[in-house]
């Protein structure tokens, strides 16, 4: 791959993240310039995989994700040079579409940062399980089973971000990766709580059977918000569990490279904002506007991250 090809791919990934990631783009953009291109490339890889699982039928999604896995493995093995035009496509029907323009930037990120192929394998495993799930199926019996899924599609995001951001000292890698996985799993639980209604509409149920039974509701009852008191208690329970997990990761920013801590803290603060909205108005999980912090709060998060170093004084 030429520098021109990589640069064009990185530019495309940045613009894609700006349009698609929306509010989280602010947090990602706090990453220093020398690491930002890698972050956008990895984000775009993850978004492409997620879109394949979400937007294609199972018969289409599984081959697409398998092709993506093969290409990713080749990149990590150093056996993809990007010269074959056909190698830019996930499936023959995708050939030439702009959504595949992230591969040169992703390959450059893999070559430049200590990313691990197993993380991306894990994410694809999680997304494949989404693609084959039966509509309306309660997939997880207990929270322990959900925890594995949360690692695959949430914890892996934290691990990859840590590899891109780097740590303050070499001896901090182990703890930083452990906390990154935990934080990503907490973020994913907030995502699950926020998107219960939207997920139900496409036949997906992530709330464990044990939680539904504890509150005396079915997945269908939760999606229709009846009875409201039990449904609200369930949502608040999920959110409080996630917030408790986030508290346990308070040291994470202190382990990161100093110039990357602001980006990590801003993303955490954004998710805390989503959690607060859901605690105050849990019905937003199934109807009304998608739960997110107000615009003024997003601006304040970015300003605080840049000027106040809040992770040094707050847990």
Q: What do the predicted segments below correspond to?
A:
Residues 1-187, 193, 197-315:
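Catalytic cores of Mg2+-dependent Asp-rich isoprenoid enzymes
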């Amino acid at each position: 791959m030429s520098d021109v090809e990589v640069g064009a791919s990185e530019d495309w990934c940045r613009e894609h993240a700006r349009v698609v990631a929306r509010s989280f783009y602010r947090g990602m953009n706090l990453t220093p310039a020398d690491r930002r291109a890698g972050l956008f490339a990895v984000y775009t890889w993850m978004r492409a995989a997620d879109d394949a699982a979400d937007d294609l039928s199972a018969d289409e999604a599984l081959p697409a994700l398998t092709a993506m896995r093969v290409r990713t493995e080749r990149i990590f093995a150093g056996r993809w040079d990007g010269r074959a035009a056909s190698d830019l496509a996930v499936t023959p029907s995708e050939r030439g579409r702009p959504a595949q323009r992230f591969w040169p930037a992703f390959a450059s990120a893999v070559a430049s940062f200590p990313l691990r192929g197993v993380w991306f394998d894990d994410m694809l495993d999680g997304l494949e399980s989404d693609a084959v799930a039966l509509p309306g199926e309660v997939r997880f019996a207990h929270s322990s089973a959900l925890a594995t899924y949360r690692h695959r599609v949430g914890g892996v995001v934290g691990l990859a971000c840590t590899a891109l951001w780097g740590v303050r000292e070499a001896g901090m890698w182990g703890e930083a990766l452990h906390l990154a996985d935990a934080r990503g799993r907490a973020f994913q639980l907030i995502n699950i709580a926020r998107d219960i209604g939207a997920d139900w509409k496409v036949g997906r149920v992530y709330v464990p059977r044990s939680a539904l039974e504890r509150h005396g509701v079915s997945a269908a009852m939760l999606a229709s918000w009846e009875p409201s008191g039990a449904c609200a208690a369930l949502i608040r329970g999920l959110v409080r569990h996630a917030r408790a997990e986030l508290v346990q990761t308070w040291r994470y920013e202190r382990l990161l490279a100093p110039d990357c801590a602001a980006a990590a803290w801003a993303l955490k603060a954004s998710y805390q904002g989503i959690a607060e909205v859901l605690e105050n108005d849990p019905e937003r999980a199934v109807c009304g506007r998608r739960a997110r912090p107000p615009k003024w709060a997003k601006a304040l998060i970015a300003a605080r991250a840049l000027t106040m170093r809040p992770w040094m004084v707050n847990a």
